[in-house]
Structure formats: structure tokens, C-alpha cells
Regions:
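Conserved Rossmann-like nucleotide-cofactor binding loop
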Residues: 14, 37, 205
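Short, flexible, mixed-charge acidic loops at enzyme active sites
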Residues: 42-49, 132
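Glycine-rich FAD pyrophosphate-binding loop
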Residues: 23-45
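N-terminal Rossmann-like FAD-binding beta1-loop-alpha1 element of flavoenzymes
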Residues: 4-31
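Short loop/edge segments at beta-strand edges and connector loops
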Residues: 33, 87, 120-122, 170-172, ...
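Helical element adjacent to the flavin cofactor pocket in flavoenzyme catalytic cores
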Residues: 140-197, 201, 205
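Dinucleotide-binding Rossmann-like beta1-alpha1 core, especially the glycine-rich loop
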Residues: 48-128, 137
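Flavin-dependent oxidoreductases
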Residues: 17, 177-237
């Protein structure tokens, strides 16, 4: 049986980064992933790749706190991993009647500790979006928003974790977790892995992992967005 200090369940961006950070210490770490590679089966393989500034999170929530902290951590992390981070900024645009909503987002961002946040008019908007519809009058400009390739980032995190000694178990869906003699015994595919501690980073499957150990149940709410690519003519009508 393979025995470790910590087993991380889930090979998305969260699981890969947790494993990478844990291998900075004198710990024997395993990462268990149900797919054939990291960033293959979950949200990390296909999302917008935005490193959010943190203005859209409710004030006082854990999400708001870690969002702003994470945004500040990414430049140094990407430099270390050799992953491109594009600090393009973000615009939340609106018509005249949307100005109160934009102000609310601004105030929320300031309360969350977001830096370089301002409300701008068409003169600034047109510098970034020259074909924007004439009805657009205002925008919230978040200069700290960036974009990144989520799968390249996940792969880079996992590669550094591997170089630091993390062991990976792919094609290994966790089916059972039992507490025996002070350790967790994890049955995953053809593998039985024991660990002193388990980190649940299974993303959309995290609630099911919790159920396997009888831990607190929590609801998951899923959302799916759509992105549209428009030609120059189409943009003018949005």
C-alpha cells in the first residue's frame, strides 16, 4: 500500500497548486485524479481564464478575501512557473441607466480592497473598445484584472509538484475512503492509498467526496456561460 502525509483529490488548478505548495515542505504528497491527466475533466480545462480583480464578490465573504489575495499572488506565481499572465484589465460597460449598478460594483470593489479601480466614460472606453455601441456611456475599469491559460497554468503547477516529489495517480476515481488506525485509506481505481490527511479539491465532484467520509454535506450550484466572437459589423450592434 502507498502511504503519504497528504493526499490531494483532484487534478484541476486548485488541486495542482495545493500539491505544488505542499511539496515545498518535507511532506510526502500524492495527487489522485480520475482522468488521464491534470486539467482534463473538470472546469480547469475550459473556462474564461480570468484572474478576477475581486469587485464582483459580496463584501465580507471568504470568496472576496481569497479573490483579492489570489489576484495579487498570480504575477509572482506565473513568473516562477513560466506561464504567461496578460494584465489586460477589465471593463464592465453600461448604458446611462446602468450607472447605479456600476457604482455599486465600484463601492463593493473598494470595500474588498481592490486596487486601481475607477468609473470611466466613453473617452476611456473607446480606447479599449473603439467599436462599442453608442448607447454605452460608462464602465467600471478594473486595471488589475488579467487573463491566463487555465490548463497551461495547471500543467505547470503539476510539473513543479512532480519535480518536488509529488506522486500522481491518474485514471483513479476515488470510490471509497475509510479511516483506519489513524490514517485514511483511499480506494481509487486499482490503487489503495493511505494518507494522514486528505485534501478535497475535486471541484464539481467535491460534494460526493465529502459523502464518502461522512463529512458535512453542502450544496453545489453550477453555472455555464457563453462567449461570442463577433466580426467588426456585429460588434457595432452589441
Amino acid at each position: 500500500m502507498n502511504c503519504y502525509d497528504i493526499a490531494v483529490i483532484g487534478g484541476g488548478v486548485v488541486g495542482a497548486e495545493i500539491a505544488r505548495r505542499l511539496t515545498d515542505y518535507s511532506l510526502k504528497v500524492a495527487l489522485i485524479e480520475k482522468c488521464a491527466d491534470v486539467a482534463e475533466g473538470g472546469a480547469s480545462k475550459a473556462n474564461s481564464g480570468i484572474v478576477h480583480a475581486g469587485f464582483d464578490c459580496h463584501v465580507g465573504t471568504l470568496k472576496a478575501k481569497v479573490n483579492v489575495l489570489g489576484s495579487k499572488m498570480y504575477p509572482e506565481l506565473c513568473e516562477r512557473l513560466g506561464v504567461e499572465l496578460i494584465n489586460c484589465g477589465a471593463l464592465v460597460v453600461g448604458r446611462e441607466e446602468d450607472l447605479p449598478k456600476i457604482r455599486t460594483l465600484y463601492e463593493q470593489g473598494i470595500a474588498n480592497g481592490v486596487e486601481d479601480l475607477e468609473i470611466v466614460g466613453r473617452d476611456v472606453i473607446e480606447k479599449y473598445l473603439p467599436t462599442v455601441h453608442e448607447d454605452i456611456k460608462y464602465a467600471l475599469h478594473a486595471k488589475t484584472s488579467s487573463i491566463i491559460s487555465p490548463y497551461y497554468a495547471t500543467i505547470a503547477m503539476a510539473e513543479e509538484a512532480a519535480l518536488n516529489g509529488c506522486e500522481f495517480f491518474f485514471n483513479s476515481k476515488v470510490e471509497k475512503i475509510e479511516r483506519k488506525d489513524g490514517v485514511y485509506e483511499i480506494t481509487a481505481g486499482d490503487n489503495v492509498i493511505c494518507a494522514k490527511a486528505v485534501v478535497n479539491a475535486a471541484g464539481a465532484g467535491s460534494a460526493e467526496i465529502n459523502k464518502l467520509v461522512g463529512a458535512e454535506e453542502f450544496p453545489l450550484r453550477f453555472a455555464r456561460g457563453e462567449y461570442m466572437l463577433l466580426d467588426q459589423i456585429g460588434r457595432a450592434h452589441v
